[in-house]
Every structure is written in structure tokens, then in C-alpha cells.
Swiss-Prot record:
Pathway this chain belongs to: Isoprenoid biosynthesis; dimethylallyl diphosphate biosynthesis; dimethylallyl diphosphate from (2E)-4-hydroxy-3-methylbutenyl diphosphate: step 1/1; Isoprenoid biosynthesis; isopentenyl diphosphate biosynthesis via DXP pathway; isopentenyl diphosphate from 1-deoxy-D-xylulose 5-phosphate: step 6/6
Family to which this protein belongs: Belongs to the IspH family.
Superkingdom of the source species: Bacteria
One Pfam short name: LYTB
Enzyme Commission number, as recorded: 1.17.7.4
Active-site residues, Swiss-Prot/TrEMBL: E135
Residues binding isopentenyl diphosphate: H47, H83, H133, S232, S233, N234, S277
Cofactor binding note: Binds 1 [4Fe-4S] cluster per subunit.
Any single GO BP term: terpenoid biosynthetic process
Residues that hold dimethylallyl diphosphate according to the record: H47, H83, H133, S232, S233, N234, S277
Protein name in UniProt: 4-hydroxy-3-methylbut-2-enyl diphosphate reductase
Keyword 4Fe-4S on entry: yes
Length: 349
């Protein structure tokens, strides 16, 4: 019989890498295998330091601007991050005669196309998102200056004054809070009944799925841990969702070492999820850290099963990706269904 105090960990599923993040990391790894180091990457490929450092160790070099690539290495490939880039970046790459591989998430690319479609139909584009986020910069950069208005809050929506309220279309950043976005859209649609929606939902399936799993696990949690980086939009939204839906406390952690166990107080139930840029190996690391201090029982809070996969760039499809190539980010509890795992009953809405 264990002398350690009992602890239930509610493990959210889905969690961690989405198909777009998986694809972006694979593109860098496959480019390194095919073309050799260095492979340059414009901006962090995904917003996670562990992933970035792991790729750096394999020969990736991260830059913020194409000008930072030494002239002697301009024959090497440069990868554009999963967040997408303004058109000016690919135009500059062509001007420099760079060989670039676009790792923009296909769902972000779809938002770009939706914004362009709105403009072609004579609509001014409203983008709901967070100022300064690379995805927002990339989406706004698909159209000329002045063609897109960024709306961040309900207050922005209340005071927005368009030139022509009858010729508006909206798109959204893919990693937003579903509830916050709904609140903004409610205001916009009441003020501007002619506001055109995109052809398909802009907030991506993975963002929605991770938020739904967090909602299911939050109520009754003494602590909700979200694995992710401070610059990860979707991870920060998960922290907010956890607290909004009943967790006593929710914190963002990058590694197990970030957890100050001495200050956690008495715990009986904690919940654990990970942002779409956070590797499963860190989830394993955190569970292991708790097992050293508690007699852990795992419950799986599963709200969806994800099977989505995206093809890598055509130039890389002749390279074989092995499990060892992805071992630095892969974990051992991807589904969470271990021998001591129980399913958490998810109430039907």
C-alpha cells in the first residue's frame, strides 16, 4: 500500500500537437534530412521553446527576418513558420532567389484565402484576433494596407465605424477563445446585419477541441496545469477557459521544473492539458514528477478523437520520416489510456 497521498489527474484529450504543428515540425526535420544543415526557419516554427531548441540541436537556424540569412547560405532552404507570413515575405524570398518551404498551417492558409475572397467581392475585411500575433500579421499582410481592420475586443466591436456597413466580411485568428469570439461576433452581427461570414469556420478544429476538453475537466479541479509557452496564444486561452469553467486555479507551465510543489497546497484532483504547440513528452515529464510525490490515478477527459493529418510539401515527400526523427517531442501517453487510466464521464450538453 502506497504511503504517498492520493491524487487524481484528469488528463485532457485531445491535447498537445495539432495536425498543423505536426506538419510544420516534420517539414523542418525532413528538410534537414534532405538538404543538410543549416536549414533556416523564419520565426519560431511553433511557439514552444522546447521544440525550437530541439530543432536547433539538429541544425535548424531561427531568424526573424530573411536579411539575417548569410549570403553564403542563401542556397539553403528557409522554412516559413506554421503561423503564416505576409505576402511581402514570400515576395522578398523570391527577390533574394531563396528556396523556401512554406510550413503555414493549411487552416491558416484557408483564412488567408477567405480574406482575399471577401475583398474580391468588394467587402472590407474585419479580422478578429490579437494585435502583434504572427498569424494576425500574416493574415493582414495578404491584402494591401487599409483593407483589413483588426478587432480585438467587444469594445472594439461596439465603437467600430466602417466606411460602408453594408460591405463587410469577417475572418478570425484560428487560436481564439470560442466564447470571446462569439461575444465579439454577436455585437458585430447586431450592428451590421449584412456582415458576411467566411465560407467555413475560422477557429480551427484543434483549438475548439482542446477548449472543450478543458471545459469538461475543469469543474472540481484544485489545480489546472496547461503545458505551453507564454507566447502561445492557444495555450493562454486554455488557461482562461479552465478558470472560467470551474478550476480553482489554472497556471501555464513549460516544463515540470516550473511547478513549485511546495506552494501547491493540498490537492486531491488536478487537471492537465497542453496547447497545440506543446509536445507530449512534457506531459509525460509532468505526470512523472507528480508520481514521485503522490499515488496517482489517471482519469481521461476525452471529448473528441482527432484523426486529421496534413501532407508535407511536395519537395519533401520522397524523404522517409522515422519514429526516431520525432522522438524528441513524442511521449508515451498520447491517448492517456494506460493500465491505471479511467474514463471521466463527460456529461452530454
Amino acid at each position: 500500500m502506497s504511503l504517498l497521498p492520493p491524487l487524481t489527474i484528469r488528463l485532457c484529450s485531445p491535447r498537445g500537437f495539432c495536425a498543423g504543428v505536426d506538419r510544420a515540425i516534420q517539414i523542418v526535420i525532413l528538410a534537414l534530412k534532405k538538404y543538410g544543415a543549416p536549414v533556416y526557419v523564419r520565426h519560431e516554427i511553433v511557439h514552444n521553446r522546447y521544440v525550437v531548441e530541439g530543432l536547433q540541436q539538429r541544425g535548424a537556424v531561427f531568424v526573424e527576418e530573411l536579411d539575417e540569412i548569410p549570403e553564403k547560405h542563401r542556397g539553403q532552404p528557409v522554412v516559413f513558420s506554421a503561423h503564416g507570413v505576409p505576402k511581402s515575405v514570400s515576395e522578398k524570398a523570391s527577390l533574394y532567389n531563396l528556396f523556401y518551404l512554406d510550413a503555414t498551417c493549411p487552416l491558416v492558409s484557408k483564412v488567408h484565402k477567405q480574406a482575399i475572397r471577401h475583398q474580391r467581392h468588394g467587402r472590407h475585411v474585419i479580422l478578429i484576433g490579437h494585435s502583434g500575433h504572427p498569424e494576425v500579421i500574416g493574415t493582414m499582410g495578404q491584402l494591401e494596407k487599409g483593407a483589413v481592420t483588426l478587432i480585438e475586443t467587444v469594445e472594439d466591436a461596439l465603437y467600430y465605424q466602417p466606411e460602408n456597413p453594408n460591405k463587410l466580411g469577417f475572418v478570425t485568428q484560428t487560436t481564439l477563445s470560442v466564447e470571446d469570439t462569439a461575444g465579439i461576433l454577436d455585437v458585430l452581427q447586431k450592428r451590421f446585419p449584412a456582415l458576411e461570414s467566411p465560407a467555413t469556420e475560422s477557429i480551427c478544429y484543434a483549438t475548439t477541441n482542446r477548449q472543450e476538453a478543458v471545459k469538461a475537466a475543469a469543474l472540481g479541479s484544485d489545480l489546472f496545469l496547461i503545458v505551453g509557452s507564454s507566447n502561445s496564444s492557444n495555450a493562454r486561452r486554455l488557461v482562461e477557459v479552465a478558470e472560467r469553467f470551474g478550476a480553482r486555479q489554472s497556471i501555464l507551465v513549460q516544463r515540470a521544473d516550473d511547478i513549485d510543489f511546495d506552494r501547491l497546497g493540498t490537492l486531491s484532483v488536478i487537471s492537465l492539458s497542453a496547447g497545440a504547440s506543446a509536445p507530449e513528452i512534457i506531459v509525460d515529464e509532468i505526470i512523472t514528477a507528480f508520481r514521485k510525490r503522490y499515488n496517482v490515478k489517471i482519469e481521461l477527459a476525452e471529448t473528441a478523437v482527432e484523426t486529421q493529418q496534413f501532407l508535407v510539401n511536395r519537395e519533401l515527400r520522397d524523404v522517409i520520416l522515422t519514429p526516431q526523427d520525432m522522438a524528441f517531442v513524442s511521449g508515451g501517453v498520447k491517448t492517456g489510456r494506460n493500465d491505471d487510466t479511467q474514463m471521466l464521464k463527460i456529461e452530454e450538453k
